[in-house]
């Protein structure tokens, strides 16, 4: 059954169902709902901007973007963004997805915390970042209607203390490898 949230649906495909199942089984409820909101906000931004893209690739990029914060997919020495991108790459490769499409998703995830660059790249890369920036930072908040924002959050609720909870989740996912945060926004998460 396909659920419509603010006029956006998750792709009705075997690949999307497997992505949902894997993310639900691997990530916390907080990250699952955050990643889902990222997808809806990203797709709404794409619709508003008139961008053309493969919705399955966008869904994969959004749902895997924080996978590198999980114990299962966290390496000892790579940035969490790269760990998440590698997890998506391995998953998509196992499903026979083309290398070109894998590279798009990998790049979208690897750059999702690098402001200013993704907006100049492939629509999937730009939109994953746009969805993340809206859900975590509220960037472009006014570009979404009250109805859209409410529908997304109703379908995938925020915790009562989302800001503190997501920062704690970032901290827990990267504290064992502080050197990977040098020169990026996650350095602030580890700062005392």
Role assignments for model-derived ranges:
Residues 2-6, 26-32, 36-51, 97, ...:
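Divalent metal-dependent phosphate-bond-processing catalytic cores, especially two-metal-ion Mg2+/Mn2+ enzymes
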Residues 38, 79-94:
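An active-site-proximal "capping" alpha-helix that borders the catalytic cofactor pocket
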Residues 2-20:
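Short alpha-helical hairpin
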Residues 16-34, 67-72:
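Active-site flanking loop/helix segments enriched in acidic
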Residues 28, 49-56, 72-80, 99:
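Alpha-helix boundary/capping segments in eukaryotic regulatory proteins
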Residues 56-74, 84, 106-115:
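His-Asp-centered metal-binding catalytic motifs of divalent-metal-dependent phosphohydrolases/nucleases
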Residues 11, 33-35, 53-57:
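N-terminal glycine-rich anion-binding loops that anchor highly charged ligand groups
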Residues 89, 93-108, 117-122:
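Internal catalytic or translocation cores that form aromatic/hydrophobic pockets or channels
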């Amino acid at each position: 059954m396909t659920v419509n949230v603010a006029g956006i649906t998750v792709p009705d495909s075997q690949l999307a169902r497997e992505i949902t199942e894997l993310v639900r089984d691997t990530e916390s409820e907080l990250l699952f709902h955050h990643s889902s909101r990222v997808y809806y906000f990203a797709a709404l931004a794409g619709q508003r901007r008139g961008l053309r893209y493969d919705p399955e690739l966008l869904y994969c990029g959004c749902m895997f973007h924080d996978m590198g914060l999980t114990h299962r997919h966290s390496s000892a020495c790579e940035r969490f963004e790269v760990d998440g991108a590698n997890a998506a790459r391995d998953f998509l490769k196992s499903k026979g997805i083309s290398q070109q499409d894998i590279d798009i998703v990998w790049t979208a995830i690897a750059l999702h915390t690098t402001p200013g660059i993704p907006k100049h790249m492939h629509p999937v890369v730009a939109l994953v970042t746009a969805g993340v920036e809206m859900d975590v930072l509220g960037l472009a908040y006014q570009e979404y209607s009250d109805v859209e924002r409410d529908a997304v959050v109703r379908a995938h609720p925020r915790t009562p203390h989302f800001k503190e909870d997501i920062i704690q989740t970032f901290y827990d996912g990267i504290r064992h490898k502080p050197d990977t945060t040098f020169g990026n926004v996650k350095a602030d998460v580890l700062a005392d």
